[in-house]
Amino acid sequence: MRHGTHTGSNPYAEAYVEVTAGGLAETDLAADPIEQFRRWLADAIRYNLPEPTAMVVATADADGRPSSRHVLLKSVDDGFVFFTNYRSRKGRDLSENPSASLCFPWFAIGRQVVVLGTVTKVTREETEEYFASRPRDSQCGAWSSENQSSVVPSRAWLDERYAEVAQRFAGVEHIPPPPFWGGFRVIPETVEFWQARPARMHDRLRYRRTADGERPWIIERLSP
């Protein structure tokens, strides 16, 4: 159930909406965080949350300056996979500092998942397979934005670039991925599952990777 909990003149306080839901106990969790994530993602999809695979990807450059943006999760295996322009700010950050944090904000059902991990590029074969599944206009868009995150003169300039790319590939049945475009895989070191509870006494359970082959993950409860 969702309900407002603050009154007064502070607009930020007025905007706060509390979500009450069932608790989250250690015994509720799968032994592996990837399996637990799949369960919660299935719940987010079942509840028809908008863009349930949208996540905030936070990176930092070599000097520690952070940046963040929303990106769509494309697959989950031993890590969390997304695709982007390698020349974008996040691509440059990850080439200098291959660590990232992900946040899945499923606040409508009182949940969020926060991942911290190291980042590697996916294979070119994985990139080609995913790129082939994209709509043709999105493929052209990837080629059009050769220097993502750079300053451009105008919207008209962007539209002209797209038209040029679409014309270039007009007779090509299968558009290949650009050499500056591909995927990253975030290999988790910690994964926190956050469940909203009344009075801000939220449940926070974190998986932490260990060097123990027989017990690769430890589950810890964090103070709310």
UniProtKB/Swiss-Prot annotation:
Its cofactor is FMN. Binds 1 FMN per subunit. The keyword Flavoprotein applies. The keyword Flavoprotein applies. Keywords: Flavoprotein, FMN, Oxidoreductase, Pyridoxine biosynthesis. Substrate binds at residues 74, 130, 134, 138, 200-202. GO terms for molecular function: FMN binding; pyridoxamine phosphate oxidase activity. FMN binds at residues 69-74, 83-84, 89-90, 112, 148-149, 194, 204. Gene3D superfamilies: Electron Transport, Fmn-binding Protein, Chain A. It catalyses: pyridoxamine 5'-phosphate + O2 + H2O = pyridoxal 5'-phosphate + H2O2 + NH4(+); pyridoxine 5'-phosphate + O2 = pyridoxal 5'-phosphate + H2O2. Coiled coil: none annotated. Pfam families: PNP_phzG_C (PF10590), PNPOx_N (PF01243). Homodimer. Catalyzes the oxidation of either pyridoxine 5'-phosphate (PNP) or pyridoxamine 5'-phosphate (PMP) into pyridoxal 5'-phosphate (PLP). NCBIfam families: pdxH, PRK05679.1. Belongs to the pyridoxamine 5'-phosphate oxidase family. This is Pyridoxine/pyridoxamine 5'-phosphate oxidase. The lineage of its organism: Bacteria, Bacillati, Actinomycetota, Actinomycetes, Acidothermales. The gene is pdxH.
